[in-house]
Design a protein with these regions (language model features):
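Short, structured motif recognition centered on aromatic/hydrophobic residues
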Residues: 118, 174
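Short helix-capping/turn signature of helix-turn-helix
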Residues: 60, 121-126
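Hydrophobic alpha-helical connector segments
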Residues: 69, 83-114, 170, 194
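C-terminal peripheral helix-coil segments that are non-catalytic and often amphipathic
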Residues: 1-7, 107, 111, 143, ...
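Amphipathic alpha-helical packing segments from all-alpha helical-bundle domains
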Residues: 76, 80, 128-154, 164-168, ...
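Helix-turn-helix
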Residues: 23, 31-65, 69
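Secondary-structure edge/capping motif, primarily at the C-terminal ends of alpha-helices
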Residues: 85-90, 119-123, 181-185
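Generic hydrophobic, amphipathic alpha-helix propensity
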Residues: 16-28, 45, 70-82
Length: 211
């Protein structure tokens, strides 16, 4: 007699659901990242994932929930990279810490244009719930930048200013630049873009404000 919960291929229901979830997420990344959220349908995602609609609804209540899960995972990955970068550059001046953290945050987007589209374009205004999630994550990023800059002021490295304004300017500029880069072929090398983004971060956050 088969062990309870291990009816198929020696996997528990939880393990099978985890595999289905992963396939749904990979398919969602492909479809949303190339065709857009509005063009994404549950039947289309299920067909491409080889997951029945019944199993889909056992995992996600709807399309929005799939998108939220995908965006959460993308953003959590980026924030984990930021934390690792800030730990690795502890004790370094802001001129080293902030550019490294910005590039760490952007690494998944620079590796995969689909991720850039999801994180920087499709997420905007997709629904009230998704928009709130985007703004909450943006607020966290603004707070991280502000904390780093305030600490740098305390060390006498830079002059104080409105860090929320500067952080929002950086986030907005980076969002537009990276997505534009991902859209176009031919494009500059990733290395060239990283240099430009690091320089931009330094100008916005460390240059002395006008007298």
């Amino acid at each position: 007699m088969a062990q309870e919960g291990r009816s198929y291929g020696g996997l528990t229901r939880e393990e099978r659901d985890a595999q289905r979830r992963q396939r749904l997420l990979e398919t969602a990344k492909e479809i949303i990242g190339t065709q857009g959220y509005a063009a994404t349908t549950i039947p289309g995602v299920c067909a491409a994932s080889k997951v029945s609609t019944r199993h889909f609804y056992e995992i996600y209540p709807g399309k929005e929930d799939l998108f939220v899960d995908l965006y959460d995972r993308i953003t959590a990955d980026s924030y984990a990279r930021v934390a690792t970068s800030l730990t690795a550059t502890a004790g370094e001046p802001i001129s080293e810490r902030v550019p490294a953290a910005v590039l760490a945050y952007l690494d998944p987007m620079l590796k995969d244009p689909r991720v850039a589209r999801i994180a920087f374009v499709e997420i905007m205004g997709a629904s009230p719930r998704i928009e709130k999630l985007r703004l909450d994550y943006r607020e966290t990023l603004v707070e991280i930048v502000g904390t780093e800059c305030a600490a740098s002021v305390g060390r006498g490295e830079i002059l104080d200013r409105d860090w929320r304004f500067a952080a929002l300017a950086l986030v907005g500029a980076v969002t537009a630049i990276v997505y534009d880069w991902a859209l176009h072929q031919p494009r500059s090398s990733r290395e060239a873009l990283e240099t430009q983004l690091a320089d931009l971060a330094l100008v916005l956050l460390t240059a002395d404000p006008p007298a």
